[in-house]
Amino acid sequence: LPESLRPLGELAINLRWSWHRETRQLFAQMDPDAWQRVGHDPVALLGEIPAERLEELAADDAFVGRVAAADADLTEYLAGHRWFQGLDGRKPHAIAYFSPEYGIAQALPQYSGGLGILAGDHLKASSDLGVPIIGVGLFYRSGYFRQSLSADGWQQETYPVLDPDGLPLTLLR
């Protein structure tokens, strides 16, 4: 990425974009057709946009300003004082939340239904409250299958093969 657009990389891998409208709009604005094509996945989008378009965006002062504002907003969000930080007494440094699946965003298809969506919403709300929660789960290399019907009416499943390097994931050790 051009220097002035480098914050887009961090914005893309922090899943807050999935519930932060302004950040989603920023990515969509880069190339609306590509945004639709990659299923609203900012990591995939950054790999899809041609270098010429990135240079064009880097020369657009208004766009660069929106990138800088989104970066500053994320920095404040991550470091800012929120509900949890205002609690009195001893607080845990981290809270583990265990679920076999998390429905955070379609760009990270690691859920199949209600349990995953509930777990994802719990992580999002905890994040907004400043709770130091860590979602511990499983990585399904095939993700969630897509359903279709055959010509004779039978359900058919298509399992996508997920490349962890192309997902908004970071391996922690």
Predicted features by range, described:
Residues L1-R173:
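Catalytic cores of carbohydrate-active enzymes across secretory and cytosolic contexts
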